[in-house]
């Protein structure tokens, strides 16, 4: 289905400046070891939200709103000397949210209405829903959108200064937090003053949201996928790593932290199925300024994030999990990339595609392309970018045909950036050109991740189960 959202349909309390340009600045970082041009959002933009807009009687009085990741953009990575940026795909994780659990009273978090991203300060704030974007989650995504505005509009002039619906494609999973994140991103990219008189602005963006049964932006249940996921914890490589890292002792340490202070704070998790789930619940408290049990030191928190990343990465032990889990979404991304590369009329004016997803979306893509380089759980507001470049001096054919298509593709390359840091596709590292994967190789690698027949490949026989068990345990 297509859902239309007004780009300027919110009224402001979190008063980002009426001119979306002046909150941003150019910051040239001349480091002796890395002389690289970077763009950085002004510090005050990140803290401009007023405390009364996100704090309540439950908030830790010492909490300060800070970005969860770096906002420095290495502009040289987007503007290499011999290449022209042709197309950008951005896959984001939603901003800070409330828990998806009835265990905690949702009055602890500060949210806005679902219809308006930012609620007028004179209006009483509505109750939060489970899994809803919080006020700070909205500001996170607005800041991300503003960073891209400064990059793609103010510096590279890649996108039009005024919103052009033909240049941008937007898709979101059918969750409030991802839909609101996409809206917030677009407000940062093309928003205005957020004033009452703009509430019925004719500017709008069409969001593609698939029916639940067709959604593929995150791993879905299937007999084979579920079996392999359950088998991972019993895999000899996973058991060996867990024993080597003393995971059992670390898990007991966290349980003791909860038991020792379960009456001090609302955050209490007696048991958990995965560290990814524990980290997500933990972040709902920490990242929104809510008190935590004593004992969650920086070292403990870092280890939790590492264990979550290890869980995600373990899926590489069964390549079929990437094919079944994220392969259909890879197919959607790759088809769009291919059409743009051969100048298909259907994407003639398209320059940027935004996909608003989840931590499981990003982690699955990082694993599938063997480019999960950081040992950390993808934080909220993370962004994964696929950048399509073309040789600047190449004169492309006026009409693309089957006979010249290969030549055109051979002059194009894909660069991957995660949270403004270049990363590298594992199977393409030895074929890179100037730090980029040739498009022809990228398409081959992508094809290896895409299921040929999802329904058939999702099935698993008892004989296959026994074979997997024998080989992995």
UniProtKB/Swiss-Prot annotation:
Gene3D superfamilies: Phosphoglycerate mutase-like (3.40.50.1240)
GO MF annotations, alphabetized: acid phosphatase activity; phosphatase activity
Principal EC category: hydrolase
Classification via InterPro entries: Acid_Pase_AS (IPR033379), His_Pase_clade-2 (IPR000560), His_PPase_superfam (IPR029033), Histidine_acid_phosphatase (IPR050645)
Annotated signal peptide: none
Active-site residue list: 94, 359
Keywords associated with the record: Hydrolase
Reactions catalysed, as given in the entry: a phosphate monoester + H2O = an alcohol + phosphate
Keyword Hydrolase: yes
EC number(s) recorded for this UniProt protein: 3.1.3.2
SUPFAM superfamilies: Phosphoglycerate mutase-like (SSF53254)
Domain of life: Eukaryota
Family of the protein in this entry: Belongs to the histidine acid phosphatase family.
Protein name according to UniProt: Probable acid phosphatase DDB_G0284755
Source organism per UniProt: Dictyostelium discoideum
